[in-house]
Amino acid sequence: MHVKTGDEVLIITGKDRGKRGKIKESRPKEQRVIVEGLNIVKRHMKPRGPTRPGGIIEMEAPIHVSNVMLICPKCGRASRTGHRFLEETDHKGRPKKVRYCKACDAVIDE
């Protein structure tokens, strides 16, 4: 996936189009992310004992990763990302793979 937990993203489609938020949770197997405070849905929950009462609860629903765009921390614009290998190596001796902003060519992962 082109985004990770903690990244700031822009929603590009749907009811929250144009809003920004931080990724709270990522689900790589489902290709979905949960963005803080966005894509709010109402769930009708059944009571689950004295500690969890029932009722209508608002919660954040997952969004497909194709509907979000990473906001570059360097230039502040929503842009596409790419991957490249650095000269330095990781702990296993392989070249380090990092994401970069295609708009300003800055490395996102340090």
From Swiss-Prot:
Source organism, top-level taxon: Bacteria
PROSITE patterns listed in its UniProt record: RIBOSOMAL_L24
Keywords, sorted A to Z: Ribonucleoprotein, Ribosomal protein, RNA-binding, rRNA-binding
A GO CC term attached to the entry: ribonucleoprotein complex
GO MF, any single term: structural constituent of ribosome
InterPro entries linked: KOW, Rib_uL2_dom2, Ribosomal_uL24, Ribosomal_uL24_CS, Ribosomal_uL24_KOW, Translation_prot_SH3-like_sf
GO biological process: translation
Annotated function: One of two assembly initiator proteins, it binds directly to the 5'-end of the 23S rRNA, where it nucleates assembly of the 50S subunit. One of the proteins that surrounds the polypeptide exit tunnel on the outside of the subunit.
Oligomer and partners: Part of the 50S ribosomal subunit.
Membership in a protein family: Belongs to the universal ribosomal protein uL24 family.
Name recorded for this polypeptide: Large ribosomal subunit protein uL24
Annotated source species: Roseiflexus castenholzii (strain DSM 13941 / HLO8)
Record lineage: Bacteria, Bacillati, Chloroflexota, Chloroflexia, Chloroflexales
